[in-house]
Amino acid sequence: MQKRKLGKSNLEVSALGLGCMGLSFGYGPAVEKQQGISLIRAAVEGGVTFFDTAEVYGPFTNEELVGEALAPFRSKVAIATKFGFKIDPNTGKQAGLDSRPAHIKEVAEASLKRLRTDVIDLFYQHRVDPDVPIEDVAGAVKDLITQGKVKHFGLSEAGANTIRRAHAVQPVAALQSEYSLWFREPEAEIIPTLEELGIGFVPFSPLGKGFLTGKIDENTAFDSSDFRNIVPRFTPENRKANQAVVDLLGKFAQEQKITPAQIALAWLLARKPWIVPIPGTTKLHRLEENLGATNVELSPQDLRQLETATSQIAVHGARYPEALQKLVGR
């Protein structure tokens, strides 16, 4: 698979990464451990060298899964994980944000153990903590980099001003935020900021939490533990209204003799050479389909047509419930 550099950092990874969250958390019950290990290892065989996890996924179990699966290939892959939530040790529930420097260092030590490694390739602040100056956060990660425990610093769902302030203390290698044909807000301010500063962009939910694959409609029932049950964009009414986006992708995919998911990923890959999407899946055939997107080349005309057609479709429903929306873009 082709490689990409995340901005001006020397972190070079496969053009597509693997978002591992859904193997343990967020989209219904966790997969059986051996199934998760097999899927992650199949990604390695398919050329993926960039794997994304976080302590809060599970919590903790996703890091353990990723660590075990990647142990035989550790020198050939980059592992990204995240800090920034307060997790109740008794219940395992999120209990707000915590990016105090002492806590960041505790999380790093615990994540290193769960990931079975002596260094974290990319350590993201999962959400901006309004109670801790971003300069202190960047300084704490800088210390971890100096100590050889972390290689690169990242931010997630941060606003442009926060990115600038953090980058002035410790160069930010990558920003991870949602970006897809279904959510294009980063184009206004975030992407120009990243381009100016030389920071890579790692879009999560590049397939719109599965919606852009064309396999979800208004009648799809989600498991009771599936995060999409509380997402306004995923109410049955909004799924019905948003079907126009999927139909459009289906039409383009048919013309190109590929799948809607491959169109959505190829579109992202064509946006900038320093964009590395991290689609997730629990299914081997979907992994293979996603990886196939790296061989799709959309012509300038294809991209223009897609641009024109999608710009005429209004997307219905917020991407987060109100409480979670308050945590992004700060």
Question: Where are the predicted features?
Answer:
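N-terminal small/glycine-rich loop or linker at the start of catalytic domains
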Residues: 9-27, 80-95, 119, 124
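Active-site groove signature of glycoside hydrolases
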Residues: 112-130
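Alpha-helix N-cap and loop-to-helix initiation/capping positions
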Residues: 31-35, 61, 65, 95-103, ...
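Acidic (Asp/Glu)-rich catalytic clusters
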Residues: 67-78, 113-116, 145, 167-170
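Conserved beta-strand positions
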Residues: 18-20, 53, 122-125, 155, ...
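Beta/alpha (TIM)-barrel catalytic core signal, keyed to glycine-rich beta->alpha loops juxtaposed to Asp/Glu
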Residues: 3, 128, 132-308, 313, ...
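Short, acidic/polar
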Residues: 30-43, 99-114, 159-164
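N-terminal binding-site loop/beta-alpha segment at the start of enzyme catalytic domains
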Residues: 1-78
